[in-house]
Regions:
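Helix N-cap/capping motif at the beta->alpha junctions
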Residues: 2-11, 31-33
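Receiver (REC) domain switch/output surface
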Residues: 77-91
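Alpha4 helix (beta4-alpha4-beta5 surface) of REC/receiver domains from two-component response regulators
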Residues: 53-66
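Active-site residues of response regulator receiver
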Residues: 22-24, 30, 51
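The feature encodes the CheY-like receiver
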Residues: 27-28, 41
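C-terminal output/effector regions of signal-responsive regulators
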Residues: 90-150
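A Lys-centered signature of the CheY-like receiver
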Residues: 70, 74
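Active-site beta3 strand of CheY-like receiver
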Residues: 15-21
Length: 150
């Protein structure tokens, strides 16, 4: 979807949107205002600021996942979107990993070592945690390397 000003962007924003590209200087509403509205709504999207405004220390508190200074090539923009997709995947996997680790921790506190060792489901949980840890590490490496290439 494409919106030509901040107000249109907010009108079209719903749960099916995964990534938002904003400019700090947009008609009707600034990118910062749109970003504040997105945060207020609690919409789970990755946001990149693509703008001619050079970054300053204020970006530290800006709720964006990436900040790109124009002019931007199509290849760079595609790379930004791909990186944000990877960040979303990373966040999802990290959330799943944390939930599984919390369950494991509860079981380790509440069950005896022999009970844990005898449980096939607990062994499966351990394997799931190990696999997710590997996936999270690989995604983290991918994000870092794509950042360096830019």
């Amino acid at each position: 979807r494409t919106a030509y000003n901040g107000s249109e962007a907010l009108e079209t924003l719903d749960g099916t949107v995964d990534i938002v590209l904003l400019d700090r200087r947009m008609p009707v509403m600034s990118g910062n205002e749109v970003l504040a509205a997105i945060e207020e709504r609690g919409v789970d999207v990755r946001v990149a600021m693509v703008t001619a405004v050079d970054p300053d220390f204020d970006i530290i508190d800006l709720g964006v996942d990436d900040y790109v200074v124009k002019p931007v090539s199509k290849d760079t923009l595609v790379g930004v979107v791909e990186r944000l997709e990877t960040v979303a995947e990373y966040n999802d996997r990290q959330k799943r990993l944390t939930a599984k680790k919390l369950k494991r921790n509860v079981l380790e506190v509440e069950k005896s070592r022999p009970e844990l060792e005898a449980s096939e489901r607990f062994s499966e949980l351990q394997a799931e945690i190990k696999a997710l840890e590997t996936e999270v590490q690989a995604l983290e490496t991918e994000i870092t390397e794509s950042r360096i290439e830019r």
